[in-house]
């Protein structure tokens, strides 16, 4: 029996070493180590052995099984490595070939417009200021010459959080806060971009949340001509170098005098079309000279300092600039919309 086991070990290991595929190795494993294999048959015959021989033969049989199993495992590992090498050799990849292009996103059109305007004003010596979107009643209204019970407050329906705090209805509070920081000493040249909130019903031209950019200049000897020159620069930067602007008298509580600013239609050149509704002009923003009361409440002497301010809706500028007909497109999170503004 001992000789038989050793012979089986030698045969099995020789066949394993000669095998050229994983299937052959598996067949050898089943042939020699399976339930119907010769080693199992030998073990079944151990009952005929004496009590002294039985442990020795059992140990030998286990040793033979381990030797064969070890040879099989080693051969499997060798063949698997060879198979991987063959696959790699047959599936050679040219690493110099261009890969699949990575999908690159596009900046939102509102971001593009805000950054363009910021770059323009920074180049003119302005700084960018920001403020809280949850604002106090004082900075949103009173510091801007809209005291309690002022009739102009009815012009804006607001989202109040408490009796004295609300979501800001304009970015003008940033101007009031900034003026206070200067403690009555100019010059001040700032723009204030940010989100604002009003209780409007959402439709093609209105949104309960939108973006504004306001500008403020306070210094000695500031006049309406300075305001007009600044706004002409903005209009030509945003809508083309041949644009003209006109100022129409208006009313805002925080400026005096106040004006609405129109730009000559960039589609028809002022001849009249559907974009400008036949007038040749398109309204783009409101502006005016800073009201003396606003200067006083912020610590500036209106006898010594003057200033101008202006405010524009970013969505309106973007809609005009890119020919967008519905403000709701800006907030639908539709990648097909933003992809149209992809820049190289």
From Swiss-Prot:
Q: What main location does UniProt list?
A: cytoplasm
What GO terms describe the biological role, i.e. biological process, of this protein?
phenylalanyl-tRNA aminoacylation
Q: What InterPro entries does UniProt report for this protein, alphabetically?
A: aa-tRNA-synth_II, aa-tRNA-synth_II/BPL/LPL, Phe-tRNA-synth_IIc_asu, Phe-tRNA_ligase_II_N, Phe_tRNA_ligase_alpha1_bac, Phenylalanyl-tRNA_Synthase, tRNA-bd_arm
- Residues where Mg(2+) binds: 256
The places in or outside the cell where this protein is found are: Cytoplasm
The UniProt keywords, alphabetically, are:
Aminoacyl-tRNA synthetase, ATP-binding, Cytoplasm, Ligase, Magnesium, Metal-binding, Nucleotide-binding, Protein biosynthesis
Cofactor, free-text remark: Binds 2 magnesium ions per tetramer.
Question: Cellular component per GO?
Answer: cytoplasm
Q: What class of enzyme is it?
A: ligase
Q: Which residues form a coiled coil?
A: none
* Cofactor(s) annotated in UniProt: Mg(2+)
Name the EC number(s).
6.1.1.20
GO MF annotation, one: ATP binding
Q: Which PROSITE patterns match?
A: AA_TRNA_LIGASE_II
What does the record give as the reaction this protein catalyses? tRNA(Phe) + L-phenylalanine + ATP = L-phenylalanyl-tRNA(Phe) + AMP + diphosphate + H(+)
What protein family does this chain belong to? Belongs to the class-II aminoacyl-tRNA synthetase family. Phe-tRNA synthetase alpha subunit type 1 subfamily.
- Assembly: Tetramer of two alpha and two beta subunits.
HAMAP family xrefs: Phe_tRNA_synth_alpha1
Its protein name is Phenylalanine--tRNA ligase alpha subunit
Source organism: Bacillus pumilus (strain SAFR-032)
């Amino acid at each position: 029996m001992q000789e038989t086991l050793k012979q089986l070990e030698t045969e099995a290991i020789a066949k394993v070493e000669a095998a050229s595929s994983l299937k052959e190795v598996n067949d050898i494993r089943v042939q020699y180590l399976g339930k119907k294999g010769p080693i199992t048959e030998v073990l079944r015959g151990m009952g005929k052995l004496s009590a002294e021989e039985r442990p020795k033969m059992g140990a030998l049989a286990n040793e033979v099984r381990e030797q064969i199993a070890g040879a099989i495992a080693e051969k499997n590992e060798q063949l698997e490595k060879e198979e991987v090498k063959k696959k790699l050799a047959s599936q050679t990849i040219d690493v110099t070939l261009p890969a699949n292009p990575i999908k690159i996103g596009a900046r939102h059109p509102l971001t593009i417009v805000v950054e363009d305007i910021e770059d323009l004003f920074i180049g003119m010596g302005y700084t960018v200021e920001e403020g809280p979107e949850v604002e106090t009643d004082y900075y949103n209204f009173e510091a801007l010459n809209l005291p309690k019970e002022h009739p102009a407050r009815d012009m804006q329906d607001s989202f109040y959080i408490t009796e004295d705090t609300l979501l800001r209805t304009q970015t003008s509070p940033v101007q009031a806060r900034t003026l206070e920081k200067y403690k009555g000493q100019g010059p001040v040249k700032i723009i204030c971009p940010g989100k604002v909130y009003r209780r409007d019903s959402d439709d093609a031209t209105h949104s309960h949340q939108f973006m504004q950019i306001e500008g403020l200049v306070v210094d000695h000897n500031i006049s309406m001509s300075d305001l007009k020159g600044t706004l002409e620069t903005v209009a030509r930067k945003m809508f083309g170098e041949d644009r003209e602007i006109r100022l129409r008298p208006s009313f805002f509580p925080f400026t005096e005098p106040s004006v609405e600013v129109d730009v000559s239609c960039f589609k028809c050149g002022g001849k009249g079309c559907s974009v400008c509704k036949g007038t040749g002009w398109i309204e783009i923003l409101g502006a005016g000279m800073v009201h003396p009361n606003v200067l006083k409440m912020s610590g500036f002497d209106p006898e010594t300092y003057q200033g101008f301010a202006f405010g524009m809706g970013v969505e309106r500028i973007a809609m005009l600039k890119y020919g967008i007909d519905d403000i709701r497109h800006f907030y639908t999170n539709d990648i097909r919309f933003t992809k149209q503004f992809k820049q190289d």
